[in-house]
Design a protein with these regions (language model features):
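Conserved N-terminal phosphate-binding loop of PLP-dependent enzymes in the Aspartate aminotransferase
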Residues: 2-449
């Protein structure tokens, strides 16, 4: 068994134990029982790796929270942050700045179709909140259609629009949110037939009244709820259904955008232009917080002669906009879209090999460098290795093995993710998957005979 690598590092001000103790004493960890949290202390990061204060190295196989797309501490982005901070950190959103102007123009050039107006936020949840507010203002309608297997952010409205169990404790939430089934049902290996998927959507629209629905908010490729990739024809049919009823289509690309699937935005794989597109995470590769709502011309023009219904102190934050510009330049100049396609093919091939080798792997899914393993006790029944919204000894042991071996990824319910930074090399990709290969021996032992 290969041990995780350890480096001798200059001693920081705090040890790892001190970091953990003080963080747990004085700060809250999200979505977690505070007495059970066991965070990894992080002192520095570079490329696809990060290190503890004591020098233990981890391969970041999840790009932190699917956001560090260009890797850690990229010198070009660090320099852009330093340069902008020395010149102008902040100007209020009623002013004009060069980074804001240049970023708006740049996003207009890379977004699908005629999306060319942007409202900047602090992150993905705020982007989705503002997108539905815009949709309601433009259409004069109130209802927002979403899907069950989804996550749209941690603010009040975004959580209401979220389908997964993180919304439960906030219910009833904001009014007007209606839910439709996902194209890939929980506990099944494959998506539903296309005709059945569209029929489900048509039923919800019929029962709720298409004339009452302002927007359909959807993750183009569903992220934390399973890396669910829409079947061919689905996005086109959704676009046609929205057009038929005058419903605005909002593509949540917070996680799937900026090269993660091998395109600037995942929706480009299916040749569909949404009315609005939301983004964050890879927009700055999480170096500085920034999100955005992109709007097609007809949506943006609705506010030419009336007030735009939103505002934030940090809207169009100067330092964040400069960071985004530098990040986008890295994607372009280093060919990271092509890199995601090339290495995504290698990732998919090795994931399928591991699926064949290990009986506990019920399914693997990936598009670009956006992937997931689904772990089961029985391939015939697709019984999950851990229950919906729950844990199991086997999945806990698998996560502990990854951590011991220096592989960082997200283990959730009966799944774990393969979402490395786009700058990963083929050798580094195999390094991570070799650890996965050994770890799956743990879950294989729990497979029913």
């Amino acid at each position: 068994m290969t041990e995780a690598k350890t480096e001798i590092m200059p001693r920081p001000q705090m040890s790892g134990a001190e970091m953990v103790e003080l963080c747990k004493r004085h700060t809250m960890y999200e979505w977690s029982v505070q007495s059970k949290i066991d965070p990894i202390p992080v002192a520095k990061a570079e490329g696809v790796y990060f290190w503890t204060p004591e020098g233990k190295r981890y391969l970041d196989f999840n790009s932190q929270l699917m956001c560090s797309n260009i890797g850690h501490s990229h010198p070009r982005v660090v320099h852009a942050i330093q340069t902008q901070a020395a010149k102008l950190c902040y100007a209020n959103p009623f002013m004009a700045t060069e980074p804001r102007a240049r970023l708006g123009k740049k996003l207009a050039s890379i977004c699908p179709g005629d999306i060319d107006s942007f409202f900047f936020t602090n992150g993905g949840a705020e982007a989705n909140e503002n997108a539905i507010r815009i949709a309601r203002a433009v259409t004069g309608r109130h209802k927002i259609m979403v899907r069950y297997r989804s996550y749209h952010g941690g603010t009040a409205g975004a959580l209401t629009m979220t389908g997964d169990p993180r919304r439960w404790f906030t219910e009833p939430g904001i009014p007007g949110v209606i839910r439709a089934p996902e194209f890939h049902k929980y506990g099944r290996k494959d998506p539903e037939p296309l005709e059945a998927c569209i029929r489900d959507l048509e039923d919800v629209i019929r029962y709720e009244g298409g004339q009452n629905i302002a927007a359909f908010l959807m993750e183009t490729v569903v992220g934390t709820n399973g890396i669910l990739i829409p079947p061919d024809g689905y996005m086109k049919a959704v676009r046609e259904l929205c057009d038929k009823h005058g419903i605005l289509l909002i593509a949540d690309e917070v996680m799937a955008g900026f090269g993660r699937t091998g395109k600037w935005f995942a929706v480009e794989h299916w040749g569909v232009v949404p009315d609005m597109i939301t983004m964050a995470k890879g927009l700055t590769s999480a170096y500085v917080q920034l999100g955005a709502v992109g709007m097609r011309a007809p949506v943006a023009q609705a506010f030419k002669d009336r007030a735009f219904p939103g505002g934030l102190t940090y809207n169009s934050h100067t330092l964040a906009c400069a960071t985004a510009l530098a990040t986008i330049a890295v994607y372009e100049d280093e060919g990271l879209m092509a890199q995601a396609v090339k290495l995504g093919g290698i990732l998919r091939e090795r994931m399928k090999e591991l699926e064949k080798k290990h009986p506990s792997v019920g399914a693997t899914r990936s598009i670009g460098l956006f992937g997931i393993f689904e772990i089961v006790r029985d391939r015939r029944t697709f019984e999950p290795m851990a229950p919906f919204n729950g844990h199991s000894e086997e999945m806990t042991a698998l996560g502990a093995f990854f951590r011991e071996q220096g592989l960082y990824t997200f283990v959730r319910w009966n799944t774990f993710f393969t979402n490395p930074p786009l700058v990963i090399t083929e050798a580094q990709l195999h390094e991570g998957l070799d650890i996965v290969d050994r770890g799956l021996d743990i879950t294989d032992r729990a497979v029913k005979a």
